[in-house]
């Protein structure tokens, strides 16, 4: 579990990509479902090992990936922005980005049409009927894909091991309003050019 990793004070865990590295000519792209650290944090390690294939993701996810790559001193190249509903054709594969709710902007599921069937990758998601950006998980599109038939579903969801449901991000914002609504904020700075808060 991730908590065990933190207890050992390990800052970064990078998976063994030997097989991928030995077969990099077969890799046609890296597809990012969202911008959380556990999904893009290793891109600066993985990407050059695989010969810098095209990275596909939403604008926000790619901005985070771009920062990771720049931070490691590598030149940024081969990035393609996509939006929910877009389909990317890569060789014999079609990859559709589908809007899902998560605790970060522009999260996506992926529907990958292959010659032998559809692989559905949920990415991290939650069903949130009141998301702060008012963009709901595209349950209609997910249902359409399901009706056509899915060969394999790769599902993940933060806190899946807990009973019940996860509260809406909107609830978190409302809680902050209650907690901090009557607080007095005071800041000071000795700098002469302080404009103000």
What are these regions (language model features)?
Residues 1-2, 189-192, 196-197:
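Positively charged, low-complexity/disordered segments
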Residues 3-31, 36-188:
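His/Asp/Glu-rich metal-coordinating catalytic cores
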